[in-house]
Amino acid sequence: MAKTGESLRDKPRWSLVGMTALVTGGSKGIGEAVVEELATLGARIHTCARDETQLQESLRKWQAKGFQVTTSVCDVSSRDKREKLMETVSTIFEGKLNILVNNVGTCIVKPTLQHTAEDFSFTMATNLESAFHLSQLAHPLLKASGSGSIVLISSVSGVVHVNGASIYGVSKGAMNQLGRNLACEWASDNIRTNSVCPWFIETPLVTESLSNEEFRKEVESRPPMGRVGEVNEVSSLVAFLCLPAASYITGQTICVDGGFTVNGFSFKPLP
């Protein structure tokens, strides 16, 4: 049975000073916001992305803010590159890692009957296999830290139906179950695992879709809060789940969706 050691009780509950983190896909969107949120709380961070130019632009910005961030180019859909990434992280952080944020994801929007075998394998490799394998690779580092936290950036598509996203939804639903499994299996190693499921968030991934005024109105009509989310509304939850303040929270799937997943039949009462 895992115990809350003196070292955990003695840590500041609302600080990540002295902790280390790996955030995949950290050069834009939710990943970039997560890097900044964790760094603001004092964590040392390594992040990766496929686009070296964009990664270097982000790094210059973080260095100007005084954040402790290192970077490397990595396509996490490749098994060999994931292994090399974790070797790099282990070297930088001297064999210990407190936080793993599996953020990288892709979505191919098509009706189910139009999806190809290539669509399926690419989506699964990028979204699910990468999260599964990186969690495996990170386990000894997380265990060595004495207090580990894994956050899986999932989606409401893994909780409810979203049209045109059948493969994506399958990958995210499996990711949510992975979070529950790891939470139970690795609790004795003082490693917590939680999934965060956003609805539409203002990111480069959805900019083109949301530029269609009719589509945006439809999206905004679904959550009771009547709008899409901002990246910092996701990154703040991710950061909280990594804090000592969240030390008894594990195995949870938490939606950041303005109430989308709990919204039933809404109507205005008759006059």
From Swiss-Prot:
EC number assigned by the record: 1.1.1.-
Activity's dependence on pH: Optimum pH is 7.5 for quinuclidinone reduction. Optimum pH is 6.0 for 4-methylcyclohexanone reduction.
Transmembrane segments: none
Binding-site residues for NADP(+), renumbered to this chain: 22-46
Group of enzyme by EC: oxidoreductase
Pfam hit, one: adh_short_C2
Any one GO molecular-function label of the UniProt entry: oxidoreductase activity
Binding site residues for substrate: 155
Keywords from the UniProt entry: NADP, Oxidoreductase
Catalytic residues of the enzyme: 168 (proton acceptor)
Signal listed as a keyword: no
Assigned protein family: Belongs to the short-chain dehydrogenases/reductases (SDR) family. SDR65C subfamily.
Function noted in UniProt: Oxidoreductase active on cyclic ketones, but not on tropinone or nortropinone.
Family annotation (PANTHER family): SENESCENCE-ASSOCIATED PROTEIN 13, TROPINONE REDUCTASE
Record's protein name: Tropinone reductase homolog At2g29360
The species this protein was found in: Arabidopsis thaliana
